[in-house]
Swiss-Prot record:
Protein name, as recorded: Phosphoserine aminotransferase
Function description: Catalyzes the reversible conversion of 3-phosphohydroxypyruvate to phosphoserine and of 3-hydroxy-2-oxo-4-phosphonooxybutanoate to phosphohydroxythreonine.
Organism: Flavobacterium psychrophilum (strain ATCC 49511 / DSM 21280 / CIP 103535 / JIP02/86)
Compartments it resides in: Cytoplasm
Gene Ontology terms describing biological process: L-serine biosynthetic process; pyridoxine biosynthetic process
Length: 356
């Protein structure tokens, strides 16, 4: 049976990425060697790294605009530390918008480096919305936000325009929608949502904002060191980067971000329309802030849980259970999830309605 993978991450990837990755593991570029055993300094992998970095900037519309794309290790969680290390000045200040678990994790790390101003938070409402009315201090070294919140199913639809560097954690919605990415000075994202398997982290940074903290930065945490080493300061995670390149190529061939945005909108509209129509269900996020990537919803009557769980599992749906802090269900609709998989879930929801 075909599986419909709604996992929040690591998540579904395009079928062609699996097929090409499998071949590369057996014989990479007809070299007679596995991708898993080649030197990261070989011309074949250097070409992979160069193409991947260039394709990131091309897809985001940042080519030739003073940005560098890096493939690092440590996940987005390490970026919680690296961002203030590289951007918050000695005795400096940073402004953070608290919209969920990952934003609060970033705030926790930033507090070790200087004054960390939480300009707004939706924590008291269990992060069911994105705060709208807030003021960003003009003397902050940077402003940090999280564009999409996988656990609580909210997503920022607009971003403030300020005269300080803007940093954004886009781990769960990068490459999913059209934005003016030049409004951001630093973007970071764990690969395992819309780009590839777990194991590498993408950082896109405008070079001109670096080197201004006045502090010593350990080499492995220094963006400038990684830029100078062309993202190979140490041995990079070869396989995740190669798989990420394949996903980026797939996205480009599909028509780029504008093309995938239309598909993602169609998927989200289909599911949210059913959640709103079907009286057995209710969404957990405020309607205006609903995420196109992660739809969170509950059954109005928990007595129907066992039946619904059996029905969606029997339909080949996987990974639909919600995070423990929210409960209910979470349908993660990342780029590679086809519209037909969302239709299968909607059909199950309608079938439950007919049975009750």
């Amino acid at each position: 049976m075909k599986k419909h993978n709604y996992s929040a991450g690591p998540c579904i990837l395009p079928q062609e990425v699996f097929e090409k990755s499998a071949q590369a593991i057996l014989d990479f570029n007809h070299s007679g060697l596995s991708l898993l055993e080649i030197s990261h300094r070989s011309k074949d992998f250097v070409a992979v790294m160069e193409e991947a970095r260039a394709l990131v900037l091309e897809l985001l519309g940042l080519k030739g605009k003073g940005y560098q794309a890096l493939f690092l290790a440590g996940g987005a969680s390490l970026e919680f530390l690296m961002v203030p290390y590289n951007l918050m000045k000695e005795n400096g200040k940073a402004a953070y918008l608290d919209t969920g678990t990952w934003a609060s994790g970033a705030i926790k790390e930033a507090k070790h480096f200087g004054e960390t101003v939480v300009i707004a938070s939706s924590k008291e409402e269990n992060y069911n919305h994105i705060p709208k009315n807030y003021s960003i201090p003009s003397d902050a070294n940077y402003f940090h936000c999280t564009s999409n919140n996988t656990i609580f199913g909210t997503q920022m639809k607009s971003f403030p325009e300020v005269n300080i560097p803007v940093v954004c954690d886009m781990s769960s919605d990068i490459f999913s929608r059209v934005l003016d990415f030049s409004k951001f000075d630093l973007i970071y994202a764990g690969a395992q949502k819309n780009m590839g398997p777990a194991g590498t982290t993408l950082v896109i940074v405008k070079e001109e904002i670096l080197g201004k903290t006045g502090r010593y930065i350990p080499s492995m945490l220094d963006y400038e060191k990684h830029i100078k080493a062309e993202s190979m300061y140490n041995t990079p995670p070869v396989f995740p980067i190669y798989a990420s390149l394949l996903t980026l190529q797939w996205l480009k061939n599909l028509g780029g971000i504008s093309a995938i945005e239309k598909i993602n909108n169609a998927k989200a509209n289909l599911l949210y329309s059913e959640i709103d129509r079907n009286t057995l269900f209710k969404g957990t996020a405020n309607a205006e802030d609903r995420s196109n990537m992660n739809a969170t919803f509950l059954l109005n009557n928990k007595n129907h849980t066992e039946l619904f769980d059996k029905m969606w599992a029997a339909a080949g749906i996987s990974g639909l259970s919600g995070h423990r802090s929210v409960g209910g269900y979470r349908a993660s609709m990342y780029n590679a999830l086809p519209l037909e998989s969302v239709q299968v879930l909607v059909n199950v929801m309608k079938e439950l309605e007919n049975k009750i």
